[in-house]
């Protein structure tokens, strides 16, 4: 009986540890994915860059994307 209780407790501890570890290892956001609400979730070789959206000179919002570090994006006409 004691062995069954001990085994149950050990299994419970292992399952709890696995669930906690899986929760901490959230998948990272790949390149060009929106990171507005999760700026720290971009993959390690990427950075969350923020861009303001403007209409008639007034800012109407922000967009954030996971982009390569050190790369400068320019608008093409």
From Swiss-Prot:
Coiled coil: none annotated. One of its GO terms (molecular function) is toxin activity. Keywords: Disulfide bond, Secreted, Signal, Toxin. Residues 21-26 form a propeptide. The keyword Hydrolase does not apply. It is found in: Secreted. Expressed by the venom gland. InterPro entries: Spider_toxin_CSTX_knottin. Contains 4 disulfide bonds. GO terms for cellular component: extracellular region. Pfam families: Toxin_35. Residues 1-20 form the signal peptide. Belongs to the neurotoxin 19 (CSTX) family. 08 (U8-Lctx) subfamily. This is U8-lycotoxin-Ls1n. It comes from Lycosa singoriensis. The lineage of its organism: Eukaryota, Metazoa, Ecdysozoa, Arthropoda, Chelicerata.
């Amino acid at each position: 009986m004691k062995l069954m209780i001990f085994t149950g407790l050990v299994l419970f501890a292992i399952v709890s540890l696995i669930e906690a570890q899986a929760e901490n290892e959230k998948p990272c956001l790949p390149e060009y994915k929106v990171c507005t609400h999760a700026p720290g979730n971009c993959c390690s070789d990427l950075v969350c860059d923020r861009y303001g959206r403007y209409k008639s000179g007034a800012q109407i919002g922000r967009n954030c994307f996971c982009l390569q570090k050190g790369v400068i994006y320019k608008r093409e006409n």
